[in-house]
Amino acid sequence: KGEGFSVGGGYNTRNNELGQKSLTTAIVGATMDIGPGTLSGQYATIKDNNPSDLSTIAAGLAANPATAPVATLVQNAFIQGFRQDAHLYQIGYRLTSGPHTVAVAYNNMDDRRPFNADRYSYGAAYTYALSKRTDLNAVVTHLENKNTSQDLLGGNGFLGGVASAPGKDVNSVTLSIRHRF
């Protein structure tokens, strides 16, 4: 961290229960004081061709004569469904003045799997500090699901579930009070 800016990065990889290379993530982010606020940005890659803890599905299904014929198909469907290959881009600006904090942000998830479940969202948040431990919050967020993406917004604009249909856009308005004990 420097005077008016910071830069950071990380890399993580693991093997699944079969010893295959599994989830791998790489991330780089930076902040810079611009004007009265702070600009932040982040880029991440997420890759997982061999998801963890799925290798025993077929064996469990094969034990039952009714499901044995489809055991391998079911396991392969789970593996395909849990694979990840995406690039994530985020940018935001935060301004604090006295008890007031305003933040705006945009993010874009570029899904590189055959599903092509791309999505992007943007939003704004306002926080008013009633005291050092209590604040009021208002958050407005729009999430645009593309193709097969079905993300749903939860509290304060974070992901919170599954939309009712693929490609369905969602909006969120959250009003809250927070007290830290």
Located regions from the model:
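Outer membrane beta-barrel
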Residues: K1-S6, M32, H142-N145
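Solvent-exposed loop segments that connect transmembrane elements
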Residues: R14-K21, I46-A86, M109-N116, L143-D169
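C-terminal hydrophobic structural anchor segments
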Residues: S97-S149
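Residues on the lipid-exposed face of transmembrane beta-strands in outer-membrane beta-barrel proteins
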Residues: K1-G2, V28-M32, I91-L95, A124-Y128, ...
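Loop-centered beta-sheet repeat module
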Residues: K1-L23
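Acidic, glycine-rich loop-and-beta core segments that form the ion-binding/anion-interacting portion
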Residues: L23-V28, M32-G37
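Outer-membrane beta-barrel "beta-signal"
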Residues: A165-F181
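Repeated loop/turn-to-beta-strand initiation elements of outer-membrane beta-barrel proteins
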Residues: G4-G9, P36-G41, D48, P99-V104, ...
